[in-house]
Amino acid sequence: MKKMTALLLAALMVLSMAACASKPAETAESDLAYIQDKGTLVVGITDFAPMDYQNESGEWVGFDADLAKAFAESLGVKVEFVEIVWDNKVLELDSKTIDCVWNGMTLTSEVTSAMACSNAYCNNAQVVIVPADKAADYQTVESVKDLTFAAEAGSAGEAELNALGYSVTPVSAQSDALMEVAA
């Protein structure tokens, strides 16, 4: 229970700061009042199981989705999920299409200069995925230098690949990157 409370408090920090990313002078109280007055927390989310995905009935489920639901419940409001294009997350916040982004996010300078962020609640890593039957061929950084990588547009993975000078095909979702590998 203490861990859930800590997670909810961290999420409140994200909500209270990211909900009005273009107006940092607004207080957490006014952001909270804004959400409670309208009765709905609008959450920007992407489709990437197991963190966020829609089940057979179209309901958003997964670690992030479930945490967002619990947080909205603690505020006494409903939650509405809006699937966003990851590369447009800052625009979505600034235009108030969404109140917050609830998703794994690498804290790049672009992200931290555009919105307030909570402390991390999980740690992820960048990985290279290749077909299983080719994995033995790609064991070193040197062995992948001539590959073309698929990465979600606007992601930390895309930025890192570009910084390293690799050939990158931007895709609209992480699941699309996986489909490129499978093709």
Protein language model features and the residues they cover:
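Short, low-complexity disordered leader/linker segments with a strong preference
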Residues: M1-G39
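Extracytoplasmic small-molecule ligand-binding "clamshell" domains
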Residues: E26-G104
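Short, well-ordered beta-strand segments
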Residues: V42-T46, I129, L147-A151
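Solvent-exposed loop/turn segments at secondary-structure junctions
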Residues: F48-M51, D87-N88, T106-E110, K134-A136, ...
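Ligand-binding cleft/hinge of the Venus flytrap
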Residues: Y53-S57, A68-V77, V141, G154-Q174
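Short helix-initiation/N-cap motifs at beta->coil->alpha
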Residues: E80-E92, A136, G154, T169-A183
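Ligand-binding "clamshell"
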Residues: S109-C122, Y166
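Flexible hinge/capping segments at coil-to-helix
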Residues: P131-T148
